[in-house]
Regions:
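Residue-identity detector for glycine
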Residues: 4, 21, 34-37
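Bacterial N-terminal signal peptides that target proteins for export
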Residues: 10-24
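Bacterial N-terminal signal peptides
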Residues: 23-33
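Phosphate/dinucleotide-binding and metal-coordinating scaffold of catalytic cores
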Residues: 38-415
Length: 415
């Protein structure tokens, strides 16, 4: 440790004043820094703990956030957790179908107003209102399952959220997919990160040479200010190859631009979980980020937003596989087809082993059960919560056998 400094959470070093002539305010600051040093982001995302998180927002600003909940306007706020208070952070509404004026879905950006400010090493934090999921567990359990299958996935935990000391109910604390996340889970985090945004149903087809079609769908999440040719040229080149490469050379031409093994693995996990709004979603591709390392043209997927999984226990593993340009051609490649079936089998065995998927549901339920019943702003009743929980547990028990049967049939060449 550097003399005259304190090592805070996530190894951030903050210079300290001289011990001579310390004021009460300085002592309070030192105490808060000590608290921060004792905590890390792993503590915040502890899946077995129900956190208490408090936001303090000017009452007039809060009223505007509720009245204009469809807008992305930032407002100043303080965030407090376990005695650590982050001042002058920025908060705004977030979400698509989950946006509502009652139980706000929120994004907190710690550096928006204060350059370089971090909370437990993080630039931002998502507060998911769990509005459309009566179980409040689909995303949390799904992200844990992605991680169990070796995929980079945002960490999640639960909290009771208070705004101006008024309980808002149960929320998920969600790690934001940003360069900090990438550096923790994939590589050095110096590459190009893009968030897919829904404009119109999109199935992976080539959108032409003009970059505007890609720019409208893939929002920049790193390297702000770099020219469009640098940001979007490689994305255009990838989709061109996907659509125009011949069948005999398709895999060899596309794989240097898109990690096809990782792509197929991602889709297989979604299909096992009966995801209705993912890569093979009902309205086209949805809920993913693209990441490209700084020294490479090869893209990969990052999973986000999994609150529509567990859709139907009998969801076919071939559901909509012929609609997506990328996956349709991947499934025609013998190596990738074999990989798809193998990952589905791996999912089924991981879900069944020691009650793996059901055990994760039990783990999440133990954290939130009582708090959900006391949630004053949730959309669904406690009976609906119980029914959704029972449905998830039935899915966890039955899904592995159904998928293993599908895989065995497909390996025999049967439809």
């Amino acid at each position: 440790m550097i003399a005259g400094s304190v090592l805070t959470a996530e190894s951030a070093v903050i210079p300290l004043p001289s011990m001579r002539g310390l004021t009460f305010a300085m002592l309070s600051w030192l105490f808060a820094a000590g608290l921060a040093g004792a905590q890390t982001s792993a503590d915040l995302f502890d899946p077995d703990t129900l956190q208490d998180v408090r936001l303090f927002i000017n009452s007039r600003d809060l009223q505007q956030m509720r009245e204009r909940f469809t807008e992305d306007t930032f407002f100043a706020a303080d965030l407090e957790w376990r005695g650590i208070r982050v001042r002058n952070a920025a908060v705004r509404n977030k979400g698509l179908a989950t946006r509502n004026p009652t139980k706000l879905g929120l994004r907190v950006d710690f550096a928006h107003y204060t350059a370089g400010q971090r909370f437990l090493g993080m630039r931002s934090l998502l507060l998911d209102n769990l509005w459309t999921d009566p179980s409040m567990m689909r995303e949390r359990v799904s992200m844990a399952f992605f991680a169990r299958l070796g995929q980079a996935a945002p960490r999640e935990s639960y909290c009771r959220l208070f705004i101006n000391n008024v309980l808002q109910g149960v929320y998920a604390l969600v790690e934001d997919v940003d360069p900090t996340f990438v550096s923790r889970s994939i590589d050095d985090g110096l590459g190009y990160l893009h968030e897919y945004r829904f404009v119109a149903p999109y199935f992976g087809e080539f959108l032409g040479e003009d970059l505007e079609g890609y720019k409208s769908r893939f929002a920049v999440r790193s390297h702000d200010g770099e020219p469009d040719s640098t940001q979007y040229g490689p994305i255009r080149d990838m989709f061109r190859a996907i659509s125009q490469a011949g069948a005999a050379t398709w895999e060899s031409e596309v794989d240097p631009l898109l990690d096809l093994s990782q792509f197929v693995t991602h889709v297989a996990i979604e299909q096992f979980l009966a995801e209705n709004d993912g890569i093979l979603g009902a309205a086209g591709m949805a809920n993913f980020y693209l990441y490209r390392p700084s020294n490479s043209a090869r893209h990969r997927l990052i999973v986000v937003d999994k609150d529509t999984t567990f859709f139907d226990v009998r969801f076919s593993v071939l559901t909509r596989t012929d609609e997506n340009v990328i996956f349709r051609q991947a499934l025609a490649a013998p190596r990738l087809r074999a990989l798809y079936l193998q990952v589905l089998e791996d999912c089924a065995r991981a879900a069944a082993a020691d009650g793996g998927l059901d055990a994760e549901i039990t783990r999440a339920l133990a954290v939130i059960d009582a708090a959900v019943r006391e949630d004053p702003l949730k959309q669904f009743s406690n009976d609906a919560f119980d029914q959704a929980t029972a449905s998830m547990r039935a899915f966890a028990r039955e899904r592995p056998g159904i998928v293993l049967s599908d895989v065995a049939r497909l390996r025999l060449g049967q439809p």
